[in-house]
């Protein structure tokens, strides 16, 4: 993506009206400008560039072309690759600028981000400095409870990780191929065909992996070298076939170049963030880039080089590496710095600022390190510079981890809130189960109200702010909750598993988060509890698209059918439905819309028809942002993180759901009073942290509310 351009020497052939291009390729410098414009404007949210992320693919093909050509030329002339010189050149070119931006980004994160979020950024910085950031981001992408975290200012370093891993394996591949060829072919290893065959095999395997993983594990497909190597191999194949490209007549070469540029621009416009990627969709920008590079092997004024070689394009191309490094952290860190969300004008201003920083970095850091004569003469000095840059970045992030402490409450210890099961009060005209619900809710309301005005985060907060992100109920990690691509349901019964009374808790992650409360109730009442949950998959018959998978969520539809068949066979005494209310148009429906309300009524009616009592749990309050992160920045004023009730809860949506559940013959539990007072919704009750992230309750708060949950379940079962 960002290596020095070194062409492949070949004896030029003089043909009328065309000239084979040798040596430095100014058109590739201009092509870099196209790539960086696409990425930067896409991240800035400029309309019409929804697929601008393909700019990274353009960079990969360019890198594959330049590096493969350099290695092949050396191995065919010297029978080997001087690895010290090769890695020294890469270190000079890439690492000083990357380290400069990384250290500046980490320091800025320490200043403007909440401590809890900043510490995650420092860990991202360490992984990026060690060139494994792409795999850290891939792992975070497969963790459902981490997938809602705000993007990292280091996330764009994933492509540098891919490049560095490419540099680690590609020379060995070329050297190994040369060694084999030299022993099987008389006259040495000078012909390109064997190398092209090896690259073709590697590329085909990588493309197959990309197509498979894009559906099976999108984050790993996007971030990993095995699924991106084919893009680099495509550039390498162009380098190995350069003599054939140079023999093209002028007109076909120009058509290839313009067609390739059109493919790149078309994908920038037509692809969408939800397009499964890279998969086979990446073939378009990769093919387009290969055509531009291949067609550009012939000059004559007809190809896209007449645009790409213009001074302004070349100037942007020269600064593209530093601009790529700066643009993302500036875009992400500007809103918290200014204390307000950034609209399009502000984002465009941020891209200008990042461009200015890029120019400074190129002149002050990048070029001096790249072209310094002592470094160019000494591979050891170049490698030492690269090692220093890597160590400096990692050490800076480690140091910041010690400077920015693990956030903790330092207010007075708060008494633990308590909600207990009381003997039902004798209330005229009120049955005992209804009385128990009222008593439990009254205790919860009192606990919430008592905590509403507490400002300082208590020193005995449970779980602590540092522990909150890992406060996952067992169901989230033991395989009992189905992930995106999983169907069926593991046998994860709890409570008294031999009991004739079965309670089924069903839904998405918002059903799973209530599992600790229901488990406590099931153990007390000797019920058999079956929690049947699948991420972002409510048990409502609605066509659903997964923004994560970027396609129709067929696994959800299959799982729903399997669960309904299981319920019809088991006839549980009570079915509890719980689901997030954060579904929006990207899922092909939205929470509380008419289709949602109708589907809820039908689901309740269908479950009642199999003989089960049905309880629908209403929504929890929506804090809209990560509560632990917010509190880490407001340890002296927890009320700053408490959302207003009117924003956190849709009273109209709750009323519509309540009517739908009643129409289907079920019970509905409005949970608003368990989280909110009339004007706002506290995020700490007693000494218990309510939310572990931006929408899931902590295990501790779910268990605190177990008496309320038990009373609601008793009432639903008694009412049939």
Segments from the language model and where they lie:
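Extracellular/periplasmic envelope-modification machinery, especially enzymes
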Residues: 3-7, 273, 338-348, 352-356, ...
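Membrane-interface helix/loop caps of multi-pass membrane proteins
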Residues: 2-401, 719
């Amino acid at each position: 993506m960002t290596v020095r351009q070194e062409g492949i020497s070949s004896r030029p052939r003089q043909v009328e009206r065309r000239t084979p291009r040798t040596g430095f390729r100014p058109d590739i410098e201009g092509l870099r400008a196209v790539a960086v414009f696409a990425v930067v404007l896409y991240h800035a949210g400029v309309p019409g560039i929804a697929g601008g992320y393909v700019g990274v693919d353009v960079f990969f093909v360019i890198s594959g072309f330049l590096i493969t050509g350099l290695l092949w030329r050396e191995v065919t002339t010297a029978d080997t690759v001087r690895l010290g010189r090769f890695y020294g050149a890469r270190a000079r070119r890439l690492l000083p600028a990357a380290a400069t931006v990384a250290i500046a980004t980490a320091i800025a994160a320490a200043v403007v981000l909440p401590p809890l979020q900043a510490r995650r950024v420092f860990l991202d910085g360490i992984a990026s400095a060690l060139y494994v950031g792409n795999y850290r981001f891939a792992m975070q992408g497969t963790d459902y409870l981490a997938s809602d975290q705000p993007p990292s200012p280091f996330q764009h370093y994933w492509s540098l990780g891919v490049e560095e891993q490419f540099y680690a394996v590609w020379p060995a591949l070329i050297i190994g191929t040369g060694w084999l060829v030299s022993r099987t072919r008389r006259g040495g290893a000078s012909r390109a065909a064997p190398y092209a065959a090896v690259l073709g095999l590697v590329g085909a395997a990588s493309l197959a992996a990309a197509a498979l993983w894009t559906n099976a594990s999108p984050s790993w497909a996007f971030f990993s070298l095995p699924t991106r190597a084919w893009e680099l191999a495509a550039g390498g194949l162009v380098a190995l076939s350069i003599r054939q490209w140079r023999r093209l007549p002028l007109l076909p070469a120009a058509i290839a170049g313009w067609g390739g540029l059109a493919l790149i621009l078309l994908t920038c416009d037509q692809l969408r963030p939800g397009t499964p990627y890279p998969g086979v969709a990446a073939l378009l920008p990769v093919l387009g880039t290969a055509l531009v590079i291949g067609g550009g092997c012939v000059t004559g004024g007809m190809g896209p080089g007449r645009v790409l070689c213009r001074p302004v394009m070349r100037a942007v191309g020269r600064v593209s590496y530093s601009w790529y490094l700066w643009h993302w952290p500036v875009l992400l860190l500007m809103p918290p710095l200014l204390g307000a969300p950034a609209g399009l004008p502000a984002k465009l201003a941020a891209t200008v600022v990042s461009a200015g920083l890029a120019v400074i970095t190129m002149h002050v850091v990048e070029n001096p390190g790249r072209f310094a004569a002592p470094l160019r003469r000494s591979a050891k000095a170049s490698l030492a510079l690269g090692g220093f840059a890597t160590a400096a970045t990692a050490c800076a992030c480690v140091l910041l981890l010690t400077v920015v402490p693990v956030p903790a409450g330092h207010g007075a210890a708060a008494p633990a809130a308590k909600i207990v099961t009381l003997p039902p009060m004798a209330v005229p005209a009120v049955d005992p189960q209804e009385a128990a619900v009222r008593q439990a809710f009254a205790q919860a309301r009192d606990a919430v109200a008592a905590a509403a005005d507490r400002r300082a985060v208590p020193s005995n907060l449970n779980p602590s702010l540092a522990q909150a992100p890992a406060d996952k109920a067992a169901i989230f990690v033991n395989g009992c909750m189905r992930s995106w691509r999983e169907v069926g349901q593991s046998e994860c019964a709890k409570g008294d598993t031999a009991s004739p009374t079965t309670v089924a808790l069903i839904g998405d992650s918002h059903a799973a988060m209530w599992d600790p409360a229901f488990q406590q109730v099931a153990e007390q009442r000797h019920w058999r509890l079956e929690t049947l949950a699948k991420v972002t998959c409510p048990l409502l018959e609605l066509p659903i698209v997964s923004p994560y998978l970027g396609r129709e969520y067929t696994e959800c539809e299959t799982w729903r059918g399997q669960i309904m068949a299981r319920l019809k066979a088991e006839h549980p005494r009570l079915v509890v439905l719980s689901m997030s209310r954060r579904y929006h148009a990207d899922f092909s429906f939205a929470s509380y819309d008419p289709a949602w309300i109708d589907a809820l009524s039908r689901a309740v009616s269908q479950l009642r028809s199999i003989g089960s009592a049905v309880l629908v749990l209403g929504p929890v309050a929506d804090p809209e942002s990560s509560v632990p992160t917010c509190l880490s920045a407001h340890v002296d004023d927890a009320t700053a993180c408490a959302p207003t009730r009117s924003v956190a809860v849709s009273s109209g949506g709750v009323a519509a759901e309540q009517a739908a559940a009643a129409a289907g013959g079920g019970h509905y539990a409005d949970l608003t009073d368990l989280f909110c007072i009339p004007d706002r919704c506290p995020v700490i009750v007693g000494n218990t942290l309510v939310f572990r992230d931006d929408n899931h309750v902590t295990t501790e708060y779910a268990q605190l509310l177990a008496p309320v949950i038990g009373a609601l379940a008793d009432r639903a079962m008694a009412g049939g």
